Amino acid sequence: MKIGYPCVNETLPCSAAGTFRLASYSEERLLTTVASNLACLRQILEWNVSQGLLFFRMGSGIVPFGSHEVNTFPWQEHFRADFQALGAYIKQHDMRISFHPDQFVVLNSPDPSIVQRSIAELVYQGSMLDLMELDSTAKLQIHAGGAYGDKDAALARWTDTFHNHLPDAVKARLVVENDDRLYSLRECLGLHERTGVPILFDNFHHECLNHGEPMHEALRLAAGTWHPSHDGVLMMDYSSQAPDERKGKHTDTLVPELFESFLADLNGLDVDMMLEIKDKEASAVRGAQLLRAAGLLPPMPAGYEVPVFADRPAPAPPKKRTPKPKAPAAS
């Protein structure tokens, strides 16, 4: 089992997502920004290793405009050695890496231009995993997409795009996540049957949208879509409901009681767990402590000290909802 957090480390004084406006694009600016992003990414990975956090989702913006037609510079060749060095470090420490392209990546859009741009973005992000020389257990995570008034037709378009338009290198890395509004675990299982794509399981989305499958059963159904040799163990996202907020809003910080209750649902299932929680690495460190206490992670080396996140703002208190005043009765 591995545990981690996505994209941004709020402890370190650097960003791996530096960018600039399209209007100010230049090769010089691109090179400077990518070099800075890669240097920060190395710092993040080293910090994660020091804390035993061996699952990390890299941000999509390492190379600004990486899939945009304006970017014609051969950045893959220019930064090949840098990516290879990152990959060597990742493999040395048995880390697992993923990307989660932005919501504009939609494979079942009825607009062919959106699908074309989505494929270009997947190719770009997959190429970074290839440059790091990571095997196919490093994944590209997307949602099933929209329904567009006809979910069956939308699923058919997704299937057609997968089989007939995606490069094999992208297919080997692609996983689909159950969401909280449109495509449940059951519908993602249907996509798996049509395409073989593994399902990245999101426990919180399953709580929001399901067909009555208990959590322990849902976990095993999703895990059964992953091939041990070329997919690895089940990747999953973990979060819980933010108190007194709209349904589906993620919690600001890890709630130990809910996390421990979820661990019971695993019942021995091996997973790599991404915490989609607002305070990022702070919750990941706390989650790792709970996993060690449960015997699910190895102990840290002698002398390890748990970091203190005292400079973090406290989670916002629940919003007080004041009822709207009633309109005066008609006289």
Predicted features, each with a name:
Residues 146, 176, 275:
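Conserved short-loop catalytic and cofactor-binding motifs
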Residues 152, 175-182:
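Domain-core and long-helix interface of multi-subunit machines
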Residues 103, 180, 205:
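Short, glycine/acidic-enriched loop or turn micro-motifs at the edges of active sites
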Residues 97, 174, 199-202:
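Residue-level marker for buried hydrophobic side chains located in beta-strands
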Residues 192-198, 204:
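Active-site segment flanking the S-adenosylmethionine/decSAM binding pocket
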Residues 183-184, 204-208:
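Short acidic, Gly/Ser-rich segments with clustered Asp/Glu that frequently serve as metal-coordination loops
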Residues 1-96, 103-119, 123-134, 138-139, ...:
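Alpha/beta catalytic barrel-like cores
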Residues 140-156, 246-252:
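Glycine-rich phosphate-binding "P-loop"
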